[in-house]
């Protein structure tokens, strides 16, 4: 499997509970390396832009409200098969369906407050990384 990069986000429901370190440790323990990281407080415009793919979905307003309710940690992760590995360690979107030991099973509060986001494909990883980071901020 090839070394690749993916985008990862620790959402406000997790940062408010001081889980940034615990979640990052789970990612690193899974063999992923953080090559860029910053803490941001998303504006409404940033949240709407980042989640534009969901703009016509019924949960969009609630999603934007949640993402602008507190600080978020955005990261670029690197490793073998990083996209799939990150998705596996995050667990199912609904924490009730997540496997034991995954981030969402351990830390998520609900399907809406599920603690993390991760890219689902190489194309979205590239777009999401570019949305939050300049080339000089990603240091492998």
Curated annotation (Swiss-Prot):
Q: Give the highest taxon in the source lineage.
A: Bacteria
One Pfam entry for this protein is NDK
- What InterPro entries would the database entry show? NDK-like_dom, NDK-like_dom_sf, Nucleoside_diP_kinase, Nucleoside_diP_kinase_AS
What biological processes does GO assign it? Answer: CTP biosynthetic process; GTP biosynthetic process; UTP biosynthetic process
Q: Required cofactors, per record?
A: Mg(2+)
Question: What positions does UniProt annotate as the active site of this protein?
Answer: 117
Q: What is its EC number?
A: 2.7.4.6
GO molecular function: any one? ATP binding
What reactions does this protein catalyze?
A: a 2'-deoxyribonucleoside 5'-diphosphate + ATP = a 2'-deoxyribonucleoside 5'-triphosphate + ADP; a ribonucleoside 5'-diphosphate + ATP = a ribonucleoside 5'-triphosphate + ADP
Name the chain's protein: Nucleoside diphosphate kinase
Taxonomic lineage per UniProt?
Bacteria, Pseudomonadati, Pseudomonadota, Alphaproteobacteria, Hyphomicrobiales
